[in-house]
Amino acid sequence: IGRGVYGREAVHMNIESDLKDQAKNKRLFQETLTVMKKAWTEKFFSHKGEFYTYPAPNFIWQHEMSPPSKEFLDTKTNEIKKISVVPKPKQNPHPPIWQVVDGARSIEWAAQNGLNTIMWIPTVKALKKRFEIF
């Protein structure tokens, strides 16, 4: 996964990204990762954040072939309260996540959040320094 530090990447990944606001882009990336992990690890999930709301508010269950369930909707109103993603990953709790990193803050964040790292082609000296940070 990558945050998209260049315009050609960031703006095509999410319309909310802003090349002039890297702090916002970082929050967007972090929330995207949170949603992705929820989708992989929870049978049914919901999320309400700065950028995403799942499921969409006021969405009514209208699927006659599948019975409604209190696991994912309000049975009185038929409003969907949670959604699921299928198939779930085979790996538990989810596949290993690799993040492309370059700067010290990104390396530290990846390490603190249990992500593996992919580093651009640094010199051996720079690579040693990055490994120390991780």
Predicted regions mapped to residue ranges:
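Short low-complexity, flexible loop/linker segments enriched in glycine and/or proline
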Residues: 12, 129-134
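Internal, glycine-rich beta/alpha segment that forms the wall or movable "lid"
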Residues: 1-113
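A conserved active-site cap/scaffold subdomain adjacent to cofactor or substrate pockets
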Residues: 102-131
